[in-house]
């Protein structure tokens, strides 16, 4: 009898829960429309559901009428966006994840101390753009080990490194090792920049890979952490698909042998995961569903003060 092993934790992290609540509570408090700069989180199901309730998603603040409210997404923004919002008399509400804010704060602090900052991340990702925007003259982004070899800094340059919060633990280990080898005096945060949810989801998946022959990651193609989960499996030789809907499941899975693991990115709603479980169960008669608990998460982030109940 084949098994479907469900990784835990999976799906929504506390930062995503908070960001969605920010939009929902704002809509309840002030009514539609509420403008949101960028997708609040990188998941089409979430974005479409909020759009149906009256949220309007924009990439540029010029598309927000003067004087309206605008919410910043969980990924964070550069200071230039806040300045533009102020100039246009927008009422801004910040849904940036607290762990992303921690990385912003570290960048500003160490730049003020005279350090050159190396940011491990994907240059075009909105989170990285926001961090770089804090102190652009101090930050250099590296995406791979080869970028470390091309860095122009001398051995006596004060260096500090941080990372995008949603990266592969494997990639960060490789790149940070290369940084330490080239610059032994480089320093970083006492605790990792990688967020707890990214770490837990990757480690939970790693822990079951020896027991399965296939992996499904439920998440959006635009979700960094969902893509990294798929890479965790592929890097260890286990075939893996990134799916956003039950319809994305290849019906040929019935012809595969062995057990299957399923996890979900940090912005994936649990109802989508459950729909995917039902689809697999319909394709594979007698499929046994087993929960594998790697960690229990209890992190909760408060809503912005303007949205808290008085």
From Swiss-Prot:
- GO function terms (MF aspect): 4 iron, 4 sulfur cluster binding; 4-hydroxy-3-methylbut-2-enyl diphosphate reductase activity; metal ion binding
Q: Which InterPro entries match?
A: LytB/IspH (IPR003451)
Co-factor remark: Binds 1 [4Fe-4S] cluster per subunit.
Instruction: Provide the reaction this enzyme catalyses.
Output: isopentenyl diphosphate + 2 oxidized [2Fe-2S]-[ferredoxin] + H2O = (2E)-4-hydroxy-3-methylbut-2-enyl diphosphate + 2 reduced [2Fe-2S]-[ferredoxin] + 2 H(+); dimethylallyl diphosphate + 2 oxidized [2Fe-2S]-[ferredoxin] + H2O = (2E)-4-hydroxy-3-methylbut-2-enyl diphosphate + 2 reduced [2Fe-2S]-[ferredoxin] + 2 H(+)
Source superkingdom: Bacteria
Q: Which Pfam family, any one of them, does this sequence belong to?
A: LYTB
Annotated binding of dimethylallyl diphosphate, by residue = 42, 75, 125, 223-225, 267
Q: Where does (2E)-4-hydroxy-3-methylbut-2-enyl diphosphate bind?
A: 42, 75, 125, 165, 223-225, 267
Kindly report, in one word, the top-level EC class recorded for this enzyme: oxidoreductase
Annotated residues that bind isopentenyl diphosphate are located at 42, 75, 125, 223-225, 267
Enumerate the cofactors the protein uses.
[4Fe-4S] cluster
- The residues annotated as the active site are 127 (proton donor)
UniProt pathway annotation: Isoprenoid biosynthesis; dimethylallyl diphosphate biosynthesis; dimethylallyl diphosphate from (2E)-4-hydroxy-3-methylbutenyl diphosphate: step 1/1; Isoprenoid biosynthesis; isopentenyl diphosphate biosynthesis via DXP pathway; isopentenyl diphosphate from 1-deoxy-D-xylulose 5-phosphate: step 6/6
| One example of a Gene Ontology biological process annotation | terpenoid biosynthetic process
Its Enzyme Commission number(s) read 1.17.7.4
Q: Which residues bind [4Fe-4S] cluster?
A: 13, 97, 195
Protein keywords: 4Fe-4S, Iron, Iron-sulfur, Isoprene biosynthesis, Metal-binding, Oxidoreductase
Q: Which Gene3D superfamilies match?
A: 3.40.50.11270, 4-hydroxy-3-methylbut-2-enyl diphosphate reductase, catalytic domain
Task: Give a short account of what the protein does.
Answer: Catalyzes the conversion of 1-hydroxy-2-methyl-2-(E)-butenyl 4-diphosphate (HMBPP) into a mixture of isopentenyl diphosphate (IPP) and dimethylallyl diphosphate (DMAPP). Acts in the terminal step of the DOXP/MEP pathway for isoprenoid precursor biosynthesis.
* UniProt similarity note: Belongs to the IspH family.
User: What is the designated name of this protein?
Assistant: 4-hydroxy-3-methylbut-2-enyl diphosphate reductase
Annotated organism of origin: Chlamydia pneumoniae (Chlamydophila pneumoniae)
Source taxonomy lineage? Bacteria, Pseudomonadati, Chlamydiota, Chlamydiia, Chlamydiales
